[in-house]
């Protein structure tokens, strides 16, 4: 933890995309981008590569979940939302994603 009591999460990337970031002050979660263009047909799913690796401290977890706007406008959801990212030494982030329309 840092001096403010915040858990320190480390990201490493193999992509030119920016690291995950909070779009607005007060956002509960960070936005993450796909590292590839993917077309998901209606009622099908795909695993999307983010090009990111993450280290979460022991005893904590990260969560991946759908953005409400993306889900409402396009029917795109994280398949097992919220998806748990366990505290292991080094995890490659991929998103199992489904198109529900």
Predicted feature descriptions by range:
Residues 1-93:
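DUTPase catalytic domain/fold
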Residues 92, 97-101:
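Single conserved hydrophobic/aromatic residue that forms the stacking wall/gate
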